């Protein structure tokens, strides 16, 4: 059995299937770990959702900001933007089944020393604490107060963690860290405006994974979300968003030996790269 961690799909269904062919994925014995943002901006989010859902236990995903955006739009708590490509999901005959499945997915996945999250973890959060906090959001997504949670989810404040936070402010910070964060201060104050490269990070901020002595540093965190960062693999980090949507590549890493496989997006074929 092999486990393949795969970067942000964002509706790039053709490239996703090419990548699975490239690694010779066998759903009867292999596993896919998907870092979130299955949908939006790409051409075929509906096929991505249907395919991953049908994989059942052969695929594990964590929710990304675009996946949550789909849920909010469907619930009437957010508007479609010009760049959104979610209408075919909203119009699909199996819409309700797909959305119900999506809202029951994880925000955080932990397996041994591997931790998968879409964006990142705040510096003060241990893996154990992050699991507890993610479970709060997962419960809110699946519970009877789902609509109100959707109404309250969006917002940039509070922009840092405080143990005294409660209610929807507490949930909002957890969602923002795990699905939106790229950079923060050493004390964990997040900046959501920066989407560029590491060299352009605002003064006083740094990549969340570079904060000295962050509490999760002994685990290997698998994440996506930051396409301008590109592929970043370290002993304790696998950042896998390589910008397929923007003409980059779609990346998979086989966890057992850390071999990298990539489909070049928009280049008319799949190319294998090793690392």
From Swiss-Prot:
Keyword Hydrolase among record annotations: yes
Single Gene Ontology MF annotation: bis(5'-nucleosyl)-tetraphosphatase (symmetrical) activity
Function: Hydrolyzes diadenosine 5',5'''-P1,P4-tetraphosphate to yield ADP.
Organism of origin: Nitrosospira multiformis (strain ATCC 25196 / NCIMB 11849 / C 71)
Gene3D superfamilies in the cross-refs: 3.60.21.10
EC number: 3.6.1.41
Descriptive protein name: Bis(5'-nucleosyl)-tetraphosphatase, symmetrical
Stored Pfam families: Metallophos
Family of this protein: Belongs to the Ap4A hydrolase family.
Keyword Transmembrane: no
């Amino acid at each position: 059995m092999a486990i393949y961690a795969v970067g942000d799909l964002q509706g790039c269904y053709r490239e996703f299937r090419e990548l699975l062919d490239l690694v010779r994925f066998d759903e009867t014995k292999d596993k896919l770990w998907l870092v979130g943002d299955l949908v939006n901006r790409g051409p075929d989010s509906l096929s991505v959702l249907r395919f991953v859902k049908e994989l059942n236990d052969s695929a594990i995903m964590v929710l990304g900001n675009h996946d949550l955006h789909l849920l909010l739009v469907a619930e009437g708590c957010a508007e479609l933007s010009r760049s959104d490509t979610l209408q075919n999901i909203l119009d699909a005959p199996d819409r309700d089944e797909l959305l119900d499945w999506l809202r029951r997915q994880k925000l955080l996945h932990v397996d041994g020393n591997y931790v998968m999250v879409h964006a990142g973890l705040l510096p003060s959060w241990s893996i154990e604490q992050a699991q507890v906090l993610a479970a709060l959001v997962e419960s809110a997504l699946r519970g009877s107060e789902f609509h109100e949670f959707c109404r309250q989810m969006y917002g940039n404040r509070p922009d840092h963690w405080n143990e005294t936070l409660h209610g929807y402010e507490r949930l909002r910070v957890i969602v923002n860290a795990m699905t939106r964060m790229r950079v923060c201060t050493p004390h964990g104050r997040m900046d959501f405006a920066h989407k560029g490269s590491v060299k352009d990070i605002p003064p006083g901020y740094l990549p969340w994974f570079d904060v000295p002595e962050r509490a999760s540093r002994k685990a290997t965190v698998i994440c996506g979300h930051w396409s301008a960062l590109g592929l970043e693999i370290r002993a304790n980090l696998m950042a896998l968003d390589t910008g397929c949507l923007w003409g980059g590549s779609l990346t998979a890493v086989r966890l057992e030996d850390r071999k990298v496989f990539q489909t070049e997006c928009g280049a008319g074929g799949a190319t294998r790269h090793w690392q």
